[in-house]
């Protein structure tokens, strides 16, 4: 019996949700004609945990440990947006020292996030060496986090009105040592990767996004800046004390996967510049606004009275969120992370809407992979940089 040499029908392949290069529980239904991608349908929701609904049944302080499970590789940013929202809503001022500490922690977290993007991205392309190199530097950042917050990940460090604790003795010197060491590490990455001809073959011209497309799709972060749009919230809508530091927005005009790589590597250099300036200029003073703890404080009940409360530990400060609404945003490593908060004169938010950058950046994936080769899916998906905890929430 003779078999046909070629088949004309299309093949449908499931990639994920347990595929190692999916960067989480993402499932792609890919329609192939040989090696050519005809269609791609992302299936989301495998990691949905109802984070927005949980927020409506918790006070802000009770909700803080939950938010580190969105983007679990850049947890400082989820904490920052969670405390910034009620601070803006109630017009709570934070001390200058606390603002500088926040900036230092945010930029260290940005570097750690970009490092853990770079390693798996290179592994997806077949280069294993950088995957091990990035953990060397990332471990030093986590040592700094552990010394300041007590936790390597899921720090729970930011508080309404400041931070949970001041920087320990000797921490600033260790941070400066890391900055000097890391700049040499970035040079090593560029020597190893940027001019590698095999790497350039895999990324140049792959996953092209024009500036107009990036704006129309609502992309943000390195995805937007790699398409020629100089938009960084730290410059255009400053928060914390970013307007007091000298640094440049990293951008490229090519719009391909190589441009997104160059933007992120450049951002790591700029983050080091911001950290060095913040550490050298950090002011003295308190690390939290103690007045927040007295905000709408209940009167002390008399001993053995009907309303007397036996407290095993000092309670967290709670206050009512006034009846108004606002949108707050920060420049996270993956793009614009925003919160739309609605208060209704109660301890709990009436609405807590999360604007995750990864979810919106992922929407352009089917357009990028069409008419590309099957192997290019890994390159394009890796260059987007997604974390499914943030995408599915």
Curated annotation (Swiss-Prot):
- Keyword annotations from UniProtKB, A to Z: Chloroplast, Membrane, NAD, NADP, Plastid, Plastoquinone, Quinone, Thylakoid, Translocase, Transport
Kindly give the Gene3D superfamilies that the UniProt entry links to this protein. Cytochrome-c3 Hydrogenase, chain B
Q: Which GO terms describe its biological process?
A: photosynthesis, light reaction
Q: Which InterPro entries match?
A: NADH_Q_OxRdtase_suD, NADH_UbQ_OxRdtase_49kDa_CS, NDH1_su_D/H, NiFe-Hase_large
**GO MF:** NAD binding; oxidoreductase activity, acting on NAD(P)H, quinone or similar compound as acceptor; quinone binding
Q: Which GO terms describe its cellular component?
A: chloroplast thylakoid membrane
Membrane topology field: Peripheral membrane protein
Assembly, per entry: NDH is composed of at least 16 different subunits, 5 of which are encoded in the nucleus.
Identify its protein family: Belongs to the complex I 49 kDa subunit family.
> What is the protein named?
NAD(P)H-quinone oxidoreductase subunit H, chloroplastic
Specify the species. Triticum aestivum (Wheat)
Q: What is the lineage of its organism?
A: Eukaryota, Viridiplantae, Streptophyta, Embryophyta, Tracheophyta
Primary gene name = ndhH
């Amino acid at each position: 019996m003779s078999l046909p040499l070629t088949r004309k029908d299309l093949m449908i392949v499931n990639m994920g949700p347990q595929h190692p290069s999916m960067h989480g529980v993402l499932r792609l239904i890919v329609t192939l004609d040989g090696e050519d991608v005809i269609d791609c349908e992302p299936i989301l929701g495998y990691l949905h945990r109802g984070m927005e609904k949980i927020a409506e049944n918790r006070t802000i302080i009770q909700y803080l440990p939950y938010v580190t499970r969105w983007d679990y590789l850049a947890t400082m940013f989820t904490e920052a947006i969670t405390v910034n929202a009620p601070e803006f809503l109630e017009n709570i001022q934070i001390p200058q020292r606390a603002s500088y500490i926040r900036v230092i922690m945010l930029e260290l977290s940005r570097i750690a996030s970009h490092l853990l993007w770079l390693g798996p991205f290179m592994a997806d392309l077949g280069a294993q060496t950088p995957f091990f190199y990035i953990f060397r530097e990332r471990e030093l950042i986590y040592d700094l986090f552990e010394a300041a917050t007590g936790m390597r990940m899921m720090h729970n460090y930011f508080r309404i009105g400041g931070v949970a604790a001041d920087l320990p003795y000797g921490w600033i010197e260790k941070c400066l040592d890391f900055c000097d060491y890391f700049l040499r590490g970035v040079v090593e990455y560029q020597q190893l990767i940027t001019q590698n001809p095999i790497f350039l073959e895999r990324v140049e011209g792959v996953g092209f996004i024009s500036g107009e497309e990036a704006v129309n799709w609502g992309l943000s972060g390195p995805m937007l800046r790699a398409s020629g749009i100089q938009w960084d919230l730290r410059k255009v809508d400053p928060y914390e004390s970013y307007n007091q530091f000298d640094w440049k927005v990293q951008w490229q005009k090519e719009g391909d996967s190589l441009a997104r790589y160059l933007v992120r590597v450049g951002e790591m250099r700029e983050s080091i510049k911001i950290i060095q300036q913040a550490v050298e200029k950090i002011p003295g003073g308190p690390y939290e606004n103690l007045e927040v703890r007295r905000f709408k404080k209940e009167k002390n009940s008399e001993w053995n009275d009907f309303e007397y409360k036996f407290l095993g530990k000092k309670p967290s400060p709670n206050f009512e969120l006034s009846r108004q609404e606002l949108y707050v945003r920060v420049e996270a490593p993956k793009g614009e992370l925003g919160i739309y908060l609605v208060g209704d004169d109660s301890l709990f938010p009436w609405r807590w809407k999360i604007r995750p950058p990864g979810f919106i950046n992922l929407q352009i994936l089917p357009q990028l992979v069409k008419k590309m080769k099957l192997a290019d899916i890994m390159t394009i998906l890796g260059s987007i940089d997604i974390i499914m905890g943030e995408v599915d929430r």
